[in-house]
Amino acid sequence: MSLIGSEVKPFKADAFKAGKFVTVTDDTLKGKWSVVFFYPADFTFVCPTELEDLAENYAEFQRLGVEI
């Protein structure tokens, strides 16, 4: 489900970025284009396919200034 242009509700989550765990909040992403990706569980059909596509396009997202 795409929510392009939508504001996120306040949240706080741990993420693994650049080889370390970081805390991400709605304030962290404020004013930036962002992709927030959730999946139901490991070893489901969503995990390998969509995450692989996201990883393959990561450099392009970075080039466009998008936070993932």
UniProtKB/Swiss-Prot annotation:
Asked if the keyword Cytoplasm belongs to this entry, the reply reads yes
The reply to whether Magnesium figures as a keyword in the UniProt entry is: no
Q: Tell me the ranges covered by the Thioredoxin domain, including all copies.
A: 2-68
Q: Which GO terms describe its molecular function?
A: NADH-dependent peroxiredoxin activity; thioredoxin peroxidase activity
Determine the domain of life of the protein's source: Bacteria
> Where in the cell?
Cytoplasm
An example GO CC term for this entry is: cytosol
Q: Which reaction does it catalyse?
A: a hydroperoxide + NADH + H(+) = an alcohol + NAD(+) + H2O
User: Where's the active site on this chain?
Assistant: C47
- EC annotation from Swiss-Prot or TrEMBL: 1.11.1.26
Q: InterPro entries annotated for this entry? A: AhpC/TSA, Peroxiredoxin, Thioredoxin-like_sf, Thioredoxin_domain
Q: Which UniProt keywords apply?
A: Antioxidant, Cytoplasm, Disulfide bond, Oxidoreductase, Peroxidase, Redox-active center
The similarity comment for this entry is: Belongs to the peroxiredoxin family. AhpC/Prx1 subfamily.
The further comment given in this record reads:
The active site is a conserved redox-active cysteine residue, the peroxidatic cysteine (C(P)), which makes the nucleophilic attack on the peroxide substrate. The peroxide oxidizes the C(P)-SH to cysteine sulfenic acid (C(P)-SOH), which then reacts with another cysteine residue, the resolving cysteine (C(R)), to form a disulfide bridge. The disulfide is subsequently reduced by an appropriate electron donor to complete the catalytic cycle. In this typical 2-Cys peroxiredoxin, C(R) is provided by the other dimeric subunit to form an intersubunit disulfide.
- Record note on quaternary structure: Homodimer; disulfide-linked, upon oxidation. 5 homodimers assemble to form a ring-like decamer.
This chain's function reads: Thiol-specific peroxidase that catalyzes the reduction of hydrogen peroxide and organic hydroperoxides to water and alcohols, respectively. Plays a role in cell protection against oxidative stress by detoxifying peroxides.
**What is this protein's record name?**
Alkyl hydroperoxide reductase C
Question: Which gene is the coding source of this polypeptide chain?
Answer: ahpC
